[in-house]
C-alpha cells in the first residue's frame, strides 16, 4: 500500500521537537520568503507535512500546493501523493518555487530522485527555483558511510515513525543530478551540523553525542549536560573530521564560557556556532537550482 494509513505512518508527525521549532524552523522562515521574492509567489511544497512552508511564506505567497503521503496542512490546498511515484497530480500550471525541506530528497531512491528532478524541470518554467534538502553524506551521524559510493551500499534504514530507507548525499553528486535533469545548480547550504537526529541514540556510530537532547534540555531551563562539552572520538581522516572536531571544541568552550547563563541563552550561543558551510556536513543539505 502506498497512499493509505500504513504507508504514511512512518512519516507521520513524531511529536513536538523544541529544537526544530526554536532553531531549524527559524532558518526555514528566512529561506521561504527569499525564494518567493526571487522567483515569484507560486510555491509547490514537496513533502509538505503540516504545511509549515506555506505558513512561513507570508505575504509573498500567491499560490500554494502541498504534496504529502498524508497531508495535514489545515486551510491550505494539498494533494495526497507518494513522491516515490514521481511529481504527481499537480496540474499544468508551473510553479515559481519547488521546495522540499527536512531531508525529503533522501527519502527517494537515486533513480526516484532523478525521475522527480526531470519532472520538476519539465513542469517548471525557465527560471523556476528548485530547493531540495537531502541528508548530508558527511554528517556526524554516519562517518562509516563517508567513503561509501552512491547507490545501494549507501542506502540505510532510518527511524521516523518506523524504519524507512534513506540515501545521504554529497553536494557534488546532487549538482550532477540537477544538471542531468536540466536544472542549473546555484549553491548548497548545510543545516544542523551539531544536533543530528531526533532520537538520542545513534544506530550508525556510537560516538555521536546526543547534542539535540542537550539543547532541548537547555531550552527547558536545565543545566548543560555532558553531551555539550564532550570531545569526539576519532573519525575517518579528512576535512569533515577536522570540521566536526573543531565544532565540538568550540561548543565546549562556549558552554564553559557561558557558565551561569540561563539555559535558553546558552542554547542560543551553541546554535550560533553553526557554520555557513555547504559541503554535506550537516544533518540537512539544501541544494538550490534554477530550471534552465
Provide a role label for each language-model segment:
Residues 1-37, 40-49, 129-154:
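Conserved class I S-adenosyl-L-methionine
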Residues 50-86:
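Class I SAM-dependent methyltransferase SAM/SAH-binding core
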Residues 89-98:
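A short acidic, Gly/Pro-enriched loop at the edge of an enzyme's catalytic core
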Residues 114-129:
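A short glycine-rich, Lys/Arg-flanked "PGG" loop and its adjoining helix->strand segment in the class I
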Residues 163-183:
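Short alpha-helix
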Residues 182-224, 230, 242:
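Conserved catalytic loop of SAM-dependent methyltransferase domains
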